[in-house]
Amino acid sequence: MSSTTHHPHVKVIEGMTAAAISGDKDALAKIFTDDMQFHVRGPLPKVGDHDGVDGFTDVIGTIFELTNGDVNIEALLISADDTWATEWEHAVLGRNGQKLDTHNVFAYRFEGDRIAEMWMVCTAPAGSEAFWS
């Protein structure tokens, strides 16, 4: 993984990703503010706005459930300052013998050292919704 900054928020994002993949809700609760908002856009399941750790794990858990865990992600770039961070990610998901190869963009708003708001935008091409059917 490459990063353009060594800001402490980069480590927070890397820790959040590891906790999300392992399903560690306790770690996520320490990383997210109590009222964290998670906004999901693009051809993904559970598109919309979700609240807190439970909302986040519901969305991410659904992706892992529908793919039987066949999720490979690589952070290509993470950049951060004291309030904002961005991430560019390459993801390859497998489901029912099909692959969805996409790039995702994330924007994070921090309050102190915790994530208060997060946007996930999947840039998969039009028609990719069929992957989830």
Residue spans of the language-model regions?
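Charged, low-complexity, helix/coiled-coil-prone segments
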Residues: M1-H9, L44-D54, N104-F106
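Short, low-complexity N-terminal intrinsically disordered segments enriched in polar/charged residues
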Residues: M1-K30, D34
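A beta-strand edge to alpha-helix "cap/lid" segment located at domain peripheries
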Residues: S2-T4, T57, G61-S133
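Short hydrophobic/aromatic segments of transmembrane alpha-helices and their interfaces
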Residues: V10, F38-H39, K99
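Short, mixed-charge, low-aromatic patches
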Residues: K11-A20, P43-K46, G61-E65, W88, ...
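Short glycine-rich loop/turn motifs that provide flexible caps or phosphate-binding loops at active sites
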Residues: S22, D51, N96
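A solvent-exposed, acidic/Ser-Thr-rich amphipathic alpha-helical stretch
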Residues: K25, A29, T33-D82
